[in-house]
């Protein structure tokens, strides 16, 4: 299960430095780690003088730059976070820089002062770090938010511990699900981070005996649809010649 944590904050607050230190620490613990940087003020990553740019101008939807030591994928549209996360199948953690508007992602606040902590404190914060640690006065002010304030350079082990304990997988954010007993995925995420709820409350992660993917995205199943699919498929497959005891079924349907 891939888990995600976002490092959020204002400009020059230390976001990238925090990501670097946490990534190294998680890697040293044997995890597969990926990262995504949000660039809301940048329209194009590719450059007009590059051949890859010219490929895109010809109208192709995806351009791949295959170099000796790295491969770059240019997709000619903005992707939602769940689409981006699909590229990280098999990874343990995805570290996001930015994405403060995500409503069900655990967050580390990078701040220069206590006022910035207040700005980004939305009930999803698991830690505060960044430039603020250089000022005892600002640290004292920010301590009122009851979120651990850690120096990423000398306390990265504690930050990584919090990531291990508090990072969440990507929630489905279904508007009318409420199967977990909370109003939204945002409310459930806050409750999990606060320690008053469990990830198993989410139908997507609480019942793993039936997993439905549509177009590469996992679809949460409530109890009765899950039970119906499970019993129907097992009943049909068990009747086929050559099938003995069924322990797992993989079915792929492609629309013609």
Please describe what each predicted stretch is.
Residues 192-207:
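Non-heme iron-sulfur electron-transfer modules
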Residues 164-176, 194:
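Immediate flanking context of iron-sulfur cluster ligation sites
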Residues 71-115:
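Glycine-rich phosphate-binding loop used to anchor ATP phosphates in small-molecule kinases
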Residues 1-41, 138, 172:
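Walker A (P-loop) phosphate-binding motif
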Residues 174-190, 203-204:
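Local cysteine-cluster metal-coordination motifs and their immediate loop/turn environment
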Residues 21-76:
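N-terminal phosphate/diphosphate-binding loop that engages ATP/GTP or pyrophosphate donors
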Residues 98-138:
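Conserved C-terminal guanine-recognition region of P-loop GTPase G domains, centered on the G4
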